[in-house]
Structures are given as C-alpha cells and as structure tokens.
Amino acid sequence: DYRLAWSPSPGRSDEIVIVEMDEESFSQPELNIWPWPRRFHAQVLRNLAAAGASVIGVDMILAGTSSNVQCPPGQDPFFWTPPLSPDDEALVSALKDAGNIVLAMEVVQEEVGGDEASGELIAANFPLPEFEEAALALSSVNLPKDLDGVARRYLTSVTHQDVVWPSTAIRLVSVHQDL
C-alpha cells in the first residue's frame, strides 16, 4: 500500500476520457434520482459516439428491464420477461448506432473460508439480452478485494462455463488497437 502511495502518477493522456457518475452529478436537480433513467445513459453514449470515441466502455451491469409492467396473472414470474420500456429501447438504439460499446458482466464468486479471492466462480451477471446483442462486446468488471476490503489485485480475465471474459481494460485496449 505504501509503495503505491509513494509511486509517481502516470502522465495524463488525451486519448482516454473517463465519464463518471459522482456526487457532483447527483447534485444536479435533473440527475438527483437513482437509478438514472436509461434514456440518460443512451444520451451520454450518443454524445460520446458523436464526439468520435473509438471505443466506449460501460462498467455497470445493465441487467433487467426498467419496465414497471407487472407479471400477468397465471404467468410464472420466473419465466416471464417484461417488455422493454421506451428508455430501454432508447438504450438499445444508442448501443446499435454507436457500434463500439463494450458492456460489463461479472462472475460471482462463492467465498471459501471468508476469503472471496479464493472462492469458486459459480454464476454470472449479464446485461439484458437485448443490450448484450446490441453491444460490440462484453467484459468482466470483477475486482477481488482482500479481507480488509481493499482491492490490491486486478484480474485480466475470468472464466465462466469455459468462456474466458477479458477485463474491461483489456477489452477496451484490444478494441481500440484493433487486436
């Protein structure tokens, strides 16, 4: 921890732009809601694509629809899929139009002896299938934490059901470099 704290920071790059949702974002009256409507995300993605971004990474898992439609009587809610909301449709459209967006997925680990890092990879959380189909690719956002809650390691990939999912950083660089 001390070695990292005393290490010089890498130089700034004009090639990488990070757009984050932070306290300042939430202080804006029109953005002071959570979750943000997916049309907000769609507009941000459209703006980034219009600005010429070579690749866009979204590091939050966009699972489930934002529809408030209730499961019809007589349907098994486990097997019923609600329709996409207009906000979800706007996001699908933005993903398709940009054509260069990498979405997040994560593999869930089962802790062994109270240590998540030594856990077995047991399940995965994926974006809504319509989002996954519209995106260029998926990447892993797994970031294991030590017992004290600090992330000191970075996984370059995770494997789930014999599929290797590269980390977001690896996937974004490979798309940017046409690898």
Regions found by a protein language model. Give the residues of each.
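Non-transmembrane functional regions of envelope-associated proteins
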Residues: 1-179
